[in-house]
Amino acid sequence: MKYIQSLRLRTLPLSVSGIIVGSGLAYPLMPPTNHSFATGGFWAIFILAIATTLSLQILSNLANELGDALKGTDADQHGRAAYGLQSGTITKEQIIRMIWGFAALSVLFGTTLIYSAFGSLFATPSLVFFGLGLLAIIGAVTYTLGRHSYGYMGLGDLGVFLFFGLLSTIGSFYLMTQTLTWEAVACGAAIGLPCVGVLNLNNIRDMANDRIHGKHTFASLLGPIGARVYHTLLLIGCLLLFALFGHYWTLCIIPLWAWHLWFLWTHTERLDTHMPVLMFTTLLVALLTLV
């Protein structure tokens, strides 16, 4: 149980949103004979993509905790529950072993996923996806870990958009259909925007502390007002992109996101209480694309 807090399980539903969107777009394009799990079709690829993504997300969470702890960024987060490493319930050596373990799981699930999709580990598409998988692992680890962690250089938002949005959606779509459409690209961008919003909300909350410890997030560069304008545009952009390709059911989320934005614009504290709101409404938006 002492490891559970460091896994940050509440982030996991958000991480699969792109897989849901990409898979939903791919399903109607696949022949019914490819819908069987036994034939390595839709459901096999979907489940393996989910497993790979969850492993990568937990890997990122663990590396993020270790990186922030080593840099001292999480040492003065008043009003927040301490994670395992910060509270002393687990050691640095234990969390490093967990990082290696989930990196290995990511490779295992990812390799099985690639073979299930292409029937070979050495075909050109397979090699491309191996390269993308390696980039995903590097991106998961180096967000806050290492001397040149991109999360400390204002590039975290771009990383989330690329990995949670474009790669997650387009990757799952291509693995299932072995083709690419503009709708898949646009929907990948669309679901990536509120995922960036989750990181932005986190960075607005931690803005003062991040500046003290030299963590230059995009939110800290924009300032409190600019970061809120940016946040608003992320959510509006998401809905506009989905509506552009006929996913009108996603507009049902407007009342919840309007409430979320009202809270963000009228509060400077307790922003952490809206982190689950944005995470689960983003997942809901992904599910609404299936309607």
Over which residues does each language-model region extend?
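Multi-pass membrane catalytic core of lipid/isoprenoid biosynthesis enzymes
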Residues: 76-120, 215-246, 280
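Extended hydrophobic alpha-helices typical of membrane-associated regions
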Residues: 244-291
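Membrane-embedded alpha-helical segments that form the functional core of polytopic membrane enzymes
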Residues: 35-63, 128-141, 182-201
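Intramembrane alpha-helical segments
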Residues: 81-179
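Acidic (Asp/Glu-rich) catalytic motifs at the cytosolic membrane interface
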Residues: 55-79, 196-219
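Small-residue-rich segments of transmembrane alpha-helices in multi-pass membrane proteins
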Residues: 16-22, 158-173, 219-224, 275-291
